[in-house]
C-alpha cells in the first residue's frame, strides 16, 4: 500500500517551537511519572540570579541538563528537573538601586528598608518571568509547577531551620574578624566577589627608627620597611623579619619606634616574610591585611583598626585582641593631622610626612594586584567587623571523605584536586552581609546587647523565657546568598519536612555547573546536605552523585563575554535573529562605561554587518552540545551554528524525501532486505551504542557528532542514494524492504536525536508515526532506542565500506578529469582479492548504478590494461579507460596554465614570508594566514601535477 503524503519544503522553527512547547507543558509531559517502581532521576538546576536574563553560559549548561532529562524520561525513569531562581542578594539590590536612581533620582534610604524590599520583589516578579520564558524558549522540559525561589516561604523556613540548628550545635557564632569590606556598598563580600586587577603601583621604603639605641649589623639605627600600603601604617603593631635572615637576627625581640604615631612596636620573626621582597623587613598590620592578620594571631599581636567603614582614617583607633574582643591597656593614638582623611589622601600625606622627616628611603615602581569589589568597583579593604560565621571544618571533613570514597565523582576528574585543595585549607565562613535584600538573620538583641537565636521572635521569647517587656530588635544583616543556595537540592524537595519528593528524588543524580563556583556553591551544598539529610539508616546523604564541570563560553576570539567588552551574545538572538541596529542598541545602551560605546559599536558592525540570522532553538542546542568537550572553555562559533542549522534542514529534507516518495510501499507481503538495508540498520545500531556510551561519560560532543555523522554521511549521503536503484528497478519484495527500512530507521533516528534537538524531531515524528503504526501523542514519551546485540551486521558493514571506497574513487576520477556524471564509464580492476571479488560479483548492479558505470571487468593477472587513470583502493587498482573522453592536448594545455598559476602564487607567498621586514611588522594572525594560503596553494599544485602526469600517460 502506498501512502500519499505532503510536507513543507522547509522547516520553519518560529512557526512550530512555541506551539509545541505549550502543548508539552499543558499536557503535563514535564512532570515526573510518579511511578514508584521505576528508577528516579533528578537534576536540580543551578538557579539563575533574578538580576536580568539568561546568557550563553546558562543556555549551554541547561541544554546539557535537558538532554539528560529527556533521555532519562524516554528511558522510563521517574524524572524530575527541579528549577528555580536565586535572589542573588548584592547583585539584585544593586540592580534595583541603580534603577530607582536612574528613573526616580532616589536611593534605597529614601524609600526605607520595607518599601525598598517591596520594590525588589516587584523587580523579581518581572525578571523571574523573563528568565522562565527564556528557559521555555530553550526547550527546557521543566516541571514548572515545582519552580522555586531561594526566598519563597518554604526555602526561607529551611534557611532559618539550618541557621538555628547550626547555632545550637555551636557551629554558628558571631565574632569580630577580618573580612573583605566594600567601602562603597558598605558590606562584607565573599572572595568570589573580589576581582584582583593588575596595577602599576609603588613600593615605599620607610625608615623605622630602632628604639633604645639598638643598631643593625651594619651600624644603622633604623630598619627600612617596604610597603605598598602606607595609609595603614598607623595601625602597625610589629615589624617582621625571617627567622633565618642573618641581617636581622640580632634585632629579633627588640623594638622600633613607629613614625608619626610615636609608639614602640616589636620586631618579630616569622617564616611568612620573604627575604627577597624589598628589604626583607615588612610592617605587620593585623587589622588591615589578611596575611598580617594570621601573623598577628600566631604572635598574639593587638589589632589596631585605623579605618572607618567608609575607608577614611578614624578619629580614634579601635583596638582588638586576638580573641576578637576589645583590648584594654594598649595605647594607639591617631595623630590629629590624619583624622577624617580619605584613605588615598591619607596615603599622600603620610608619604609626604615621612619625606619631610627624612624617613623616606626610596620609592620603587612595583606591579601589584589590587583587590576590587566586582560590583562596587572600588578597592576593597580588609576590615575588622562584627560578623556571623560558620565553623565549617567539621562539615568539611565529612564532605572531603564523600569525594575520596567516590560517593561523589567529578567529571572531568581533575576538578577533584581543586575541590580537595580548597576544602583541606578551609577557613570559617563569614555568612553575614550588610544588605537589605536577602534572608534576614534569625537573631535578636535586647537593649543590653544579648543575642538570642530562634526561628522567629515568638520562639525567641519562649526559648529564652523572655517577658514581653523585654524589648527585642532583629539583626539588621542578611545571610550570604551562598548560604541559602547551599540548601538547594534538599530544600526545594520540601526539607525540613520528610516529603515523598525528598525520599523519591534525593540524592539528585548530577549537578552541571562551572568550575568557578566549585568552592562557593558545590562544596557548601555537599557540606550542608551531608550534615542535615540522612538516609533511613542515618547515613549522611550526598546532594548529587556526579558533578559535571563545564568550561566557560567565550567569544570567537577566546575573550570572556562581558557587557563592558560588548561581546555578549543573547541565546534568544541566536534563535530568533536580531537586526544590526537592535544588536547595537543592546550592546551599547545603558552602559556603565559609555566611553566604550563607539569601540563596541565598531567591532559589532564588523562582526555582524547584517545582524544575526534566525537559526532556531534546535540549531543552538546542537551547537552547544557539539562544542561541549569535557571541562574546556569553548570559543563560540557562528559558522558552527550556521552549519548545524543546515544539519536540521538536512534532516527535514531527508524526512521529506522519505515520506513523500510515491513509491514507498509499507504493505504486508514478502520482503527482501538488500545489502544497503542491512548495512544502515547495523550502522544505526552502532550509532545508538556510541550515543549511549558517550552520554554515560557526559561526552555530549561525541553524542552530537554520532548523530551528525550518521544522519548526514550515512543516512542522507549514502543510504538514500542506495535506495534509489531499488525504487527504480527493484522487485516488490525489495521495494517493501527498502520502504520499511527507510521509515523505521528514520523514526528511530528521530527518537535518538530528540534529547538534543527536541522541536524538529517532534515535528517530523508527528508525520512519521502514522507510517510505522504508532498512535502515541508525543515523541517525548517514546522509548529511547536500545542497542540490539543481534543488530550488528559486520558482513554488511565491510561490504558497503568497500563499495563506498570504490564509488568515491570513481567519482574522484570523474571530478579530476572533468567528466560529466551523466557519461557512463568503464571500470577495470586489477589485483582484486578473492573476498572483494565475491562482493563485486554480488553487487555489480548496485556499483554500476551508484558510480554510473557501463561495464565492470576484472583483469586477469597477465592481462594488459588500456591507457587509463588509476586509483588504489586497498591493494586493488581501479582503472578507468579515458579513450574518447578528453582531448589530450587541450587538457594538457589547460593543466599547464593551472600549474603556472599555482607556481606563481606559491612563489609570491614564499617571497613575502622570506621578507624580514614583513615578518617583523605583520601581526601574528596575518603571518599565520599567509602560511595557511601557502600550504593550500602547494597542495593544489601537487594535485594538478598528478593530474597532468595521469593525462600525459594516456
UniProtKB/Swiss-Prot annotation:
EC numbers on record: 6.1.1.9
Catalysed transformations (reactions): tRNA(Val) + L-valine + ATP = L-valyl-tRNA(Val) + AMP + diphosphate
SUPFAM superfamilies assigned: Anticodon-binding domain of a subclass of class I aminoacyl-tRNA synthetases (SSF47323), Nucleotidylyl transferase (SSF52374), tRNA-binding arm (SSF46589), ValRS/IleRS/LeuRS editing domain (SSF50677)
Main location: cytoplasm
GO molecular function, one term: ATP binding
GO biological process: valyl-tRNA aminoacylation
Keywords linked to the UniProt accession: Aminoacyl-tRNA synthetase, ATP-binding, Coiled coil, Cytoplasm, Ligase, Nucleotide-binding, Protein biosynthesis
Matching NCBIfam families: PRK05729.1, valS
Comment block on domains: ValRS has two distinct active sites: one for aminoacylation and one for editing. The misactivated threonine is translocated from the active site to the editing site. The C-terminal coiled-coil domain is crucial for aminoacylation activity.
Protein name, as recorded: Valine--tRNA ligase
Provenance organism: Haemophilus influenzae (strain PittEE)
